[in-house]
Structures are given as structure tokens and as C-alpha cells.
Curated annotation (Swiss-Prot):
Zinc fingers classed as C3H1-type: ranges: 190-217
A Gene Ontology BP annotation from the UniProt entry: nuclear-transcribed mRNA poly(A) tail shortening
Span list, region Disordered: 256-372, 424-458, 553-575
Ranges annotated as biased composition (Pro residues): 345-356
Functional description taken from the UniProt entry: Has E3 ubiquitin ligase activity, promoting ubiquitination and degradation of target proteins. Involved in activation of the JAK/STAT pathway. Catalyzes ubiquitination of methylated RBM15. Plays a role in quality control of translation of mitochondrial outer membrane-localized mRNA. As part of the PINK1-regulated signaling, upon mitochondria damage, ubiquitinates ABCE1 and thereby recruits autophagy receptors to the mitochondrial outer membrane to initiate mitophagy.
Name this protein carries in UniProt: CCR4-NOT transcription complex subunit 4
Coiled coil stretches, renumbered: 68-104
Oligomer and partners: Interacts with CNOT1 via its C-terminus but does not stably associate with the CCR4-NOT complex. Interacts (via RING domain) with UBE2D2. Interacts with ABCE1, PINK1 and PELO.
Enzyme class per UniProt: transferase
Compartments (UniProt record): Cytoplasm; Nucleus
A GO cellular-component term linked to this record: CCR4-NOT complex
């Protein structure tokens, strides 16, 4: 860029390095063509490059073509003029920002709460998950203990809660506003911030953690004191609520609980989708300071001493001494997020009704719970449903969102099917020829009315018959496991050596059951497949024998025992 030596303009930038020209470079023109550069670039071109002028490509002479150093008077004059211009610029900015002293800017992520009792006037308390921490991540909490907000309820504290996200602040306002706690009605709204006095003076603020504004805020969110008295800032808040509701209709519903990997604790999970007039049926599992709400409308009645809306079950015995953080508070005080609200928050104009009410948060405790299970090792119950409720088991009725899968029911049906299949099996392991020889050698087949029954030939044959019965469980181990249930295959009593022989033949009930699942047969009823056998002396029998061992069912056996009869009979059919 060329300029004449006599030009009296403001310093400009060097065309090569784009740095402002210093005062000494104002009258420096190294080339006869009048192309002005700074002395630093001129020295670099001559020493490190080709030494040619960037404009006319002529070699630079040893001495600059025009160089007139400024005198001290000229330097002082230039400095004074520059300072004066800077002061004028600052004054102009201050005059433009002077009207901002009475302007307040609504902060979308700042919640202002009025009406806090002294018990709640603690930043660490308000940051807890039971309180404002449940709505989102909090950046900072500032408590104002000034009594300027005191009303008919007496002096109270106010708090500024700054959230990371603006939607968390709106959710907190909808859930906390007009809630009665400790006999005081809380009022919550978006907070406003004024401009820093140093910013209004166009000066650097010395406070690193200054909470005031140091830059111009949104014009739509800026309101004067007169406009705020007219409620303009509340209209802006309702507008933000409408916009957020259009983007996310379920913004009042908190996100699902998550597990902290470091502490292995469940973070709070709260849902605000229960109507105001219906108390929430939920199961609260407490562990330390954290709690988890599980919605369950079909849960049976809780144990005595616990409210139905919030039964508490301790997870570990080490936390039995856990209490609400507010020891010494009045027990009758209402919970901040209970459903007993005196002034429900109005729905913004122009919006359809919310699918969920914001006033159903019931986990902001104000006093120790009087009948909590944390104080006792036992759980009082009065019915079977109480046990189910005490240990977290729901009723048999499936919730709407359940898939209808009941592991116990499926297992029970599978076991019943397995037993039915065992009863319907027709092909069982056959007896060995030796056992058939023993049984046939000790029994005789009689003809007549009593044919078909096994009659002992001698007293010793009864011992053989007893040994035959004792061998059956060993040869059929699959029936051994059912002996505790079906015990009709035993010989009761020791009144005589062979008491069953003393009964008349007509008093013994003839049982000829076949093992099929539809009949009233005992599971020990055996249909043995026909097989070849040898008679006495090793002579083979031409025909095939079908041996059927039948026992009395459980019901028939008990009936026979009441009449003093022998419940067991052995029936052999020879084909």
C-alpha cells in the first residue's frame, strides 16, 4: 500500500505482515516508488530474500528513500490524540450502556425460589437428589438469607439454583412452584440477572466468579423494572415453556435411573406422570440417600405402619439407621413434592393439558419418617399378600406392559407334563427270567370265583413273595423317587407273621388297573411285555405270559385301611 510521506492519516497496517505500523514506521518509505512497509519486513527482504521491492521489483537501496523520524513533540501529540479517541469511545459505550443499569435479563437456566425455611437454607442440602438435584445437574446454588422477602409467614430465605440445562430449570419450576413445605408456600420462577457495574463502565471485572452479566444479553429476555412489575417476564417464561413443550411433550418426566459406576448406587428415578387426584402407587427401595421409585399399580397392600403410596423396604441391614436428612423437623409438615398441594401450577395458556402433572413428586422429605422399616428388624404382616408386598412380589395379575411370562407357572406346567408322560409310558424295563421263575415257583393259579389271585402254597412262599416285592423298587429305580408320595406298596402291621393270609379271599379288593393317564391307576401299575419263560425243571413254556402287577391307588388304599383290609394284591394273567 502506497502513501505519501506528507500524509497525516492514522497508522495503517503493513501490507506484508498485516501488523499495525508503529509510530516510527509512519514516515518510512524504503523504495523510490513509495511502497510503504514496516522496517521489520524491509530488513527481512534484504537479508533473507532477494532484496527486491514487492511492488516495483527494484532492488532496495542501502538507505531508505524517504525516512523522517518523528520528533518528540509529534510523538506526544500522536499519543494524546490516540488516548483522547479511546476515552471518547469508552464514554460513548458507557453512555450506550447506561440504560442497562435498570434492565434485568431472564436466565433460562436459573431458578429463583422464595419461601425457604431456615432448615432448607443450605446449598449442600438443596443440591441433594431429594431436592433440586433430582431435576438435573446443578452448577451452583446461592442462598440469600435477607429478610426482604419476609411476608405474612415470617422471615424466609431465597435461593438461586443454576442448572446446566435450561429444560431442567423449567422442570424444577413446574414441580416446586406453589408447594407448601414447613408451613410455607414456595414460589419459583426463572431468575433474572443484572449487568455488572464494571461491564457498564467498559472496564475489566476483577471478580473471577462474578455472577452478573459481562456481555449483552438476549433482547427478548431483557426487561426493565416497569416491565417486570407488569409481569412481562412471566409471559416470557410461559413462552419458553410452550416452546419446550412443543419440542418435547414429556419434558416433565425425568430420565430413567442409571447406575453410578463408581459408587454402584442407583441414582434417583422419579416419574411425574401420575394425576394430582390419584395418589401414586409406587414401591420405594431405599439405600442410603438414594432411592428408586418403581411404578406398580397392582402391588398388594403394604405391611401395617407404612403408607400405601410409598412403602419402604431396606436393602441391607447396615442402613437401618438411615434417616431423612432433616432431623428435628416437625413430623406433620407436608412433603415438598407430595400430592397435597394447595395451589396447583396453572397450565400455560394455549397448551393442551399436560399428560402428567408436575406436582406428583413425593420424595422431598421434610421430617424423619415415623414408622419407617429402617428402625426395626421385623416386618409386621397380617396376610399372605402382606408378605408379597413386604418382599417386593406383586400380585398374580399381570401389568399391562408385562409380557405375561410367569417362570413358576411355566415350570409347574412342565413338571406336570413330565409326570403325565411317565404315567403314559407303556414299555417299561422287563423283569429278568430269574425273577419270573421265582415268582411263578411260589404262586399257583386257582380256578373258580377267586381265580386270578396269587395264593401262597406254603408259609415259606410268603417270604418269597415279600422278597419279590422288595426287588421291584431296585429293578425300577425310576419309581424309587416317588416312594415318599405313593406308599401303597407296603405291608402294614406286624400283628401276625403273615397277616395278609388271614383275611378271607372275598374281602380283598380285586384291582386290575392299566397304567394310562386317564384311569385312576397307581403309578406303580406295571404292564410287562410278553416274554419267553421256562417252567419248572427248565422246560420251556410254549405260550407267552403277560405278567401284570397292580397296586391299589392312594384313595382306594386309604379306604381299605379304614376297613381293616390288606391294601395290596398281586394279579397274574397267563395267556
Amino acid at each position: 500500500m502506497s502513501r505519501s510521506p506528507d500524509a497525516k492519516e492514522d497508522p495503517v497496517e503493513c501490507p506484508l505482515c498485516m501488523e499495525p505500523l508503529e509510530i516510527d514506521d509512519i514516515n518510512f518509505f524504503p523504495c523510490t516508488c513509495g511502497y510503504q512497509i514496516c522496517r521489520f519486513c524491509w530488513h527481512r527482504i534484504r537479508t533473507d530474500e532477494n532484496g527486491l521491492c514487492p511492488a516495483c521489483r527494484k532492488p532496495y537501496p542501502e538507505d531508505p528513500a524517504v525516512y523522517k523520524p518523528l520528533s518528540q513533540e509529534e510523538l506526544q501529540r500522536i499519543k494524546n490524540e490516540k488516548k483522547q479517541k479511546q476515552n471518547e469511545r469508552k464514554q460513548k459505550i458507557s453512555e450506550n450502556r447506561k440504560h442497562l443499569a435498570s434492565v434485568r435479563v431472564v436466565q433460562k437456566n436459573l431458578v429463583f425460589v422464595v419461601g425457604l425455611s431456615q432448615r432448607l437454607a443450605d446449598p449442600e442440602v438443596l443440591k441433594r437428589p431429594e431436592y433440586f438435584g433430582k431435576f438435573g445437574k446443578i452448577h451452583k446454588v446461592v442462598i440469600n438469607n435477607s429478610t426482604s422477602y419476609a411476608g405474612s409467614q415470617g422471615p424466609s430465605a431465597s435461593a438461586y439454583v443454576t442448572y446446566i440445562r435450561s429444560e431442567d430449570a423449567l422442570r424444577a419450576i413446574q414441580c416446586v412452584n406453589n408447594v407448601v413445605v414447613d408451613g410455607r408456600t414456595l414460589k419459583a420462577s426463572l431468575g433474572t440477572t443484572k449487568y455488572c457495574s464494571y461491564f457498564l463502565k467498559n472496564m475489566q471485572c476483577p471478580k473471577p466468579d462474578c455472577m452478573y452479566l459481562h456481555e449483552l444479553g438476549d433482547e427478548a429476555a431483557s426487561f426493565t423494572k416497569e416491565e417486570m412489575q407488569a409481569g412481562k417476564h412471566q409471559e416470557y417464561e410461559q413462552k419458553l415453556l410452550q416452546e419446550l413443550y412443543k419440542l418435547n411433550p414429556n419434558f416433565l418426566q425425568l430420565s430413567t435411573g442409571s447406575v453410578d459406576k463408581n459408587k454402584n448406587k442407583v441414582t434417583p428415578l422419579q416419574r411425574y406422570d401420575t394425576p394430582i387426584d390419584k395418589p401414586s402407587d409406587s414401591l420405594s427401595i431405599g439405600n442410603g440417600d438414594n432411592s428408586q421409585q418403581i411404578s406398580n399399580s397392582d402391588t398388594p397392600s403394604p405391611p401395617p405402619g407404612l403408607s400405601k403410596s410409598n412403602p419402604v423396604i431396606p436393602i441391607s441391614s447396615s442402613n437401618h439407621s438411615a434417616r431423612s436428612p432433616f432431623e428435628g423437623a416437625v413430623t406433620e409438615s407436608q412433603s415438598l413434592f407430595s400430592d397435597n398441594f394447595r395451589h396447583p401450577n396453572p397450565i400455560p395458556s394455549g397448551l393442551p393439558p399436560f399428560p402428567s402433572s408436575p406436582q406428583t413428586s413425593s420424595d422431598w422429605p421434610t421430617a424423619p419418617e415415623p414408622q419407617s422399616l429402617f428402625t426395626s428388624e421385623t416386618i409386621p404382616v397380617s396376610s399372605s399378600t402382606d408378605w408379597q408386598a413386604a418382599f417386593g412380589f406383586g400380585s398374580s395379575k399381570q401389568p399391562e406392559d408385562d409380557l405375561g411370562f410367569d417362570p413358576f407357572d411355566v415350570t409347574r406346567k412342565a413338571l406336570a407334563d413330565l409326570i403325565e408322560k411317565e404315567l403314559s409310558v407303556q414299555d417299561q424295563p422287563s423283569l429278568s427270567p430269574t425273577s419270573l421263575q421265582n415268582s411263578s415257583s411260589h404262586t399257583t393259579t386257582a380256578k373258580g370265583p377267586g381265580s386270578g389271585f396269587l395264593h401262597p402254597a406254603a408259609a415259606t412262599n410268603a417270604n418269597s413273595l415279600n422278597s419279590t416285592f422288595s426287588v421291584l423298587p431296585q429293578r425300577f429305580p425310576q419309581f424309587q423317587q416317588h416312594r415318599a408320595v405313593y406308599n401303597s406298596f407296603s405291608f402294614p402291621g406286624q400283628a401276625a407273621r403273615y397277616p395278609w393270609m388271614a383275611f378271607p379271599r372275598n374281602s380283598i379288593m380285586h384291582l386290575n388297573h392299566t397304567a394310562n393317564p386317564t384311569s385312576n391307576s397307581n403309578f406303580l401299575d406295571l404292564n410287562l411285555p410278553p416274554q419267553h419263560n421256562t417252567g419248572l425243571g427248565g422246560i420251556p413254556v410254549a405260550g407267552e405270559e403277560e405278567v401284570k402287577v397292580s397296586t391299589m391307588p392312594l384313595s382306594t388304599s386309604s379306604h381299605s385301611l379304614q376297613q381293616g383290609q390288606q391294601p395290596t394284591s398281586l394279579h397274574t394273567t397267563v395267556a
